[in-house]
Amino acid sequence: MESSQATTKPTRGAGGRKGGDRKKSVSKSVKAGLQFPVGRIARYLKKGRYALRYGSGAPVYLAAVLEYLAAEVLELAGNAARDNKKNRINPRHLCLAIRNDEELGRLLHGVTIASGGVLPNINPVLLPKKSTASSSQAEKASATKSPKKA
């Protein structure tokens, strides 16, 4: 009798057939330390039929790249909004941020941003010619002399 009482029940696993408490699920985004949804990007990769197979790290890497690009564009657009004394980013600020940055401008060269406008640019040929130092001295000399009386 004592031997049967001394034996204990088998320990329960973490979920599964033996029941017991389940572990709280942790998303792939949290594991990777990202804000962008890794699971959703994996689903889009599968649904899009871009390849027959892809590795388990591919959606994580893609989510990290997209998150980095979004953070970069938003930081530059926020700076553009602050320069214009605005608290809200609008399409104009996005356009200015992308076109003024060399690398982002090259990446998004063929992209049209709705309501973004264009970069302010005046061709140097159309600008008024700057007066040289000699012509400005001649103007000063003629301005200081009194006109001759006729």
Curated annotation (Swiss-Prot):
Residues annotated with Phosphoserine modification: 146
Principal location: nucleus
One Pfam family, short name: Histone
Ranges spanned by the short sequence motif SPKK motif, renumbered to the chain: 146-149
InterPro entries: Histone-fold (IPR009072), Histone_H2A (IPR002119), Histone_H2A/H2B/H3 (IPR007125), Histone_H2A_C (IPR032454), Histone_H2A_CS (IPR032458)
Superkingdom classification of source: Eukaryota
Biased composition (Polar residues): 131-150
Assembly description: The nucleosome is a histone octamer containing two molecules each of H2A, H2B, H3 and H4 assembled in one H3-H4 heterotetramer and two H2A-H2B heterodimers. The octamer wraps approximately 147 bp of DNA.
PANTHER family per record: HISTONE H2A (PTHR23430)
Domain note: Contains one SPKK motif which may interact with the minor groove of A/T-rich DNA sites. Phosphorylation of this motif may regulate DNA binding. This motif is reiterated in both termini of histone H1 and in the N-terminus of sea urchin histones H2B, but its presence in the C-terminus seems to be unique to plant H2A.
Family: Belongs to the histone H2A family.
Reported function: Core component of nucleosome. Nucleosomes wrap and compact DNA into chromatin, limiting DNA accessibility to the cellular machineries which require DNA as a template. Histones thereby play a central role in transcription regulation, DNA repair, DNA replication and chromosomal stability. DNA accessibility is regulated via a complex set of post-translational modifications of histones, also called histone code, and nucleosome remodeling.
Identification of the protein by name: Probable histone H2A.5
Upper taxonomic lineage: Eukaryota, Viridiplantae, Streptophyta, Embryophyta, Tracheophyta
